[in-house]
Amino acid sequence: MKILRKNHPLLKIINHSFIDLPTPSNISSWWNFGSLLGMCLVIQILTGLFLAMHYTSDTTTAFSSVAHICRDVNYGWLIRYLHANGASMFFICLFIHVGRGIYYGSYVLSETWNIGIILFLTTMATAFVGYVLPWGQMSFWGATVITNLLSAIPYIGSTLVEWIWGGFSVDKATLTRFFAFHFILPFIIAAFALVHLLFLHETGSNNPSGLNSDSDKIPFHPYYTTKDLLGIFLLLLVLMILALFFPDILGDPDNFTPANPLNTPAHXXPXXXXLFAYAILRSIPNKLGGVLALILSILILAAFPLLNTSKQHGLIFRPVTQVIYWXXIANLLVLTWIGGQPVEYPFTMIGQIASITYFAIXIILIPVSNTIENNIIKL
């Protein structure tokens, strides 16, 4: 078996990626989230496949087909709630994974980092088009509001929006194409995830100390396969508790009402995962400015390798930047809270302050703290 594993053309790739892979001996549980994201993707594709067997992407039947899945299909309610809450778990793991990458300086592996940003954006796009499919009130108005943002693009904006809609409003054509996108994008994500791993294994994993670990590597199996398995069981436990006891806690009550173009909800709020970006968008009075800020709030991650001037790898021995990092996490939580609040005083002002702080931390404060710490080392 050992000879086959090392010599067979297909098994050799798996062996070098998951069995005999040299891994730093000191990576902590924060490194578990990569495998958890892989697990989330598998759960989403499998549950999504079964949902697609019973769902119809037509404005007249979409809402009732989701009700039919929950009422008449064997364990349809469970498949649907695993899919809906699995998406939330996916984003929680994604945010922790990115947060860990920033904290431990994984952005210096620039190819892996940039493909990670593409994965992040693709996942957000997939979640958005998926949120439209149940064709409830929030699905319809969320689709209308978010796609309308493209009309802020000069010259081609309005034409682009109508092209995406497939008409003059969000309608049957929009729903059908969103279903097509939602079906294909997870497979594109899976392909990018493999490229992400390919580039990671070119350089080897980072580790909490930020030091070179070439002299202290251990095989991935059995040490980290066991560790990942524990993480996966814990993830499944949380997911099952969510799906079985609190299935609708992360959803929106408006989505229990079928889509009605004549009746607008009190305030359209996106899914919990993208609220921080939505809060940044709303903080800027100008439409085009808001859209640019929304895009930059994600693309700012691509600036981390460029703005990094520190002589040290990661924040483990950098107390000044650690304080700024945790302030940024708190800032992100404030933005997430603001995104779900109505557009009125004091929420608008808090949102504007938090948005300015968000960009200031990443573009000004972290590079300044890098310089301060480099000078402290010289002393």
Swiss-Prot record:
<keyword id="KW-0408">Iron</keyword>
<dbReference type="InterPro" id="IPR048260">
    <property type="entry name" value="Cytochrome_b_C_euk/bac"/>
</dbReference>
<dbReference type="GO" id="GO:0045275">
    <property type="term" value="C:respiratory chain complex III"/>
</dbReference>
<keyword id="KW-0472">Membrane</keyword>
<dbReference type="GO" id="GO:0006122">
    <property type="term" value="P:mitochondrial electron transport, ubiquinol to cytochrome c"/>
</dbReference>
<feature type="binding site" description="axial binding residue">
    <location>
        <position position="83"/>
    </location>
    <ligand>
        <name>heme b b562</name>
    </ligand>
</feature>
<keyword id="KW-0496">Mitochondrion</keyword>
<dbReference type="InterPro" id="IPR005797">
    <property type="entry name" value="Cyt_b/b6_N"/>
</dbReference>
<feature type="transmembrane region" description="Helical">
    <location>
        <begin position="113"/>
        <end position="133"/>
    </location>
</feature>
<dbReference type="InterPro" id="IPR048259">
    <property type="entry name" value="Cytochrome_b_N_euk/bac"/>
</dbReference>
<feature type="binding site">
    <location>
        <position position="201"/>
    </location>
    <ligand>
        <name>a ubiquinone</name>
    </ligand>
</feature>
<dbReference type="GO" id="GO:0008121">
    <property type="term" value="F:ubiquinol-cytochrome-c reductase activity"/>
</dbReference>
<feature type="transmembrane region" description="Helical">
    <location>
        <begin position="33"/>
        <end position="53"/>
    </location>
</feature>
<comment type="function">
    <text>Component of the ubiquinol-cytochrome c reductase complex (complex III or cytochrome b-c1 complex) that is part of the mitochondrial respiratory chain. The b-c1 complex mediates electron transfer from ubiquinol to cytochrome c. Contributes to the generation of a proton gradient across the mitochondrial membrane that is then used for ATP synthesis.</text>
</comment>
<feature type="binding site" description="axial binding residue">
    <location>
        <position position="97"/>
    </location>
    <ligand>
        <name>heme b b566</name>
    </ligand>
</feature>
<feature type="transmembrane region" description="Helical">
    <location>
        <begin position="347"/>
        <end position="367"/>
    </location>
</feature>
<dbReference type="InterPro" id="IPR016174">
    <property type="entry name" value="Di-haem_cyt_TM"/>
</dbReference>
<protein>
    <recommendedName>
        <fullName>Cytochrome b</fullName>
    </recommendedName>
</protein>
<dbReference type="InterPro" id="IPR027387">
    <property type="entry name" value="Cytb/b6-like_sf"/>
</dbReference>
<dbReference type="Pfam" id="PF00033">
    <property type="entry name" value="Cytochrome_B"/>
</dbReference>
<comment type="subunit">
    <text>The cytochrome bc1 complex contains 11 subunits: 3 respiratory subunits (MT-CYB, CYC1 and UQCRFS1), 2 core proteins (UQCRC1 and UQCRC2) and 6 low-molecular weight proteins (UQCRH/QCR6, UQCRB/QCR7, UQCRQ/QCR8, UQCR10/QCR9, UQCR11/QCR10 and a cleavage product of UQCRFS1). This cytochrome bc1 complex then forms a dimer.</text>
</comment>
<keyword id="KW-0479">Metal-binding</keyword>
<dbReference type="InterPro" id="IPR005798">
    <property type="entry name" value="Cyt_b/b6_C"/>
</dbReference>
<keyword id="KW-0349">Heme</keyword>
<comment type="similarity">
    <text>Belongs to the cytochrome b family.</text>
</comment>
<dbReference type="GO" id="GO:0005743">
    <property type="term" value="C:mitochondrial inner membrane"/>
</dbReference>
<feature type="binding site" description="axial binding residue">
    <location>
        <position position="196"/>
    </location>
    <ligand>
        <name>heme b b566</name>
    </ligand>
</feature>
<dbReference type="InterPro" id="IPR030689">
    <property type="entry name" value="Cytochrome_b"/>
</dbReference>
<keyword id="KW-0813">Transport</keyword>
<feature type="transmembrane region" description="Helical">
    <location>
        <begin position="320"/>
        <end position="340"/>
    </location>
</feature>
<keyword id="KW-0999">Mitochondrion inner membrane</keyword>
<feature type="transmembrane region" description="Helical">
    <location>
        <begin position="288"/>
        <end position="308"/>
    </location>
</feature>
<dbReference type="Pfam" id="PF00032">
    <property type="entry name" value="Cytochrom_B_C"/>
</dbReference>
<feature type="transmembrane region" description="Helical">
    <location>
        <begin position="178"/>
        <end position="198"/>
    </location>
</feature>
<keyword id="KW-0830">Ubiquinone</keyword>
<keyword id="KW-0679">Respiratory chain</keyword>
<feature type="transmembrane region" description="Helical">
    <location>
        <begin position="77"/>
        <end position="98"/>
    </location>
</feature>
<keyword id="KW-0812">Transmembrane</keyword>
<dbReference type="GO" id="GO:0046872">
    <property type="term" value="F:metal ion binding"/>
</dbReference>
<keyword id="KW-1133">Transmembrane helix</keyword>
<keyword id="KW-0249">Electron transport</keyword>
<feature type="binding site" description="axial binding residue">
    <location>
        <position position="182"/>
    </location>
    <ligand>
        <name>heme b b562</name>
    </ligand>
</feature>
